[in-house]
Amino acid sequence: MFVPILAYLLDRLPFGNSLQGISRRQLSNLMLQNNAPSWHEYAIINRKWRRHACTACRWLNAVLPKNSSIFEPGCGSGANLLWLGQQGFQRLYGSDISVGALELGQNLASLLSLPLEVWHDDGLNPAHVPTELDGILSVNWLYHIPGASLGAFLARYRCALKIGGYLACDMVTRHYDRVPGNTWHTKDKNLPEEKRRPSEYTLRLDEPEIRCVACRNGFAVVKSTCFTFSRPQRAVYLLRRVE
């Protein structure tokens, strides 16, 4: 009984989730140098409260040996990979469509003396994916892409993982379907409907659906947790590639 309760609490407490070794001033200076989207500064400063990202990283940290290779499509500034680097991982790779975010990540890695290899690519239709990976991290992007499919994503990246390799991901749950105004962009809620953009949360799945999609694409769900009171409600999953 004690172990599940402890695991539940660790997934939700902010301790140990911050990126160490960089001040707000240093980060602001790097933001100016790289012309990275301002959202990345917020995400790095507030990383410890972004539980869906932190939990996925912590789970990979717990199950993978430190010599493992980890790839994050949609890595942005690489903050998640750099956190893993601060836990002792050395073979860290990422891709993103934002050149400014990638440059920020490279400069952060240099400042923190951490290994990081990143390149410009589309996570849904990648031109280059590493092979024989031990782990893949995918958080905070797939459900923002109109028309994205978790099944297609798993099918595409399964072959990049070793048999027995892990994939940690998050997903917005269908609870958000019941939130008033869920079809509209959250920043447009006070605008007239004709001026509102569609919701930024374009893909929403509950755990039974995740398990079904995972099974169909050669993965088993090892563990999951749902952040019930987050808005939007998100769940995190650790999948393992099976033969």
Each model region followed by its residue ranges:
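Class I (Rossmann-like) S-adenosyl-L-methionine-dependent methyltransferase catalytic domain
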Residues: 1-64, 71-116, 120-128, 168-243
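Conserved acidic residues
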Residues: 68, 134
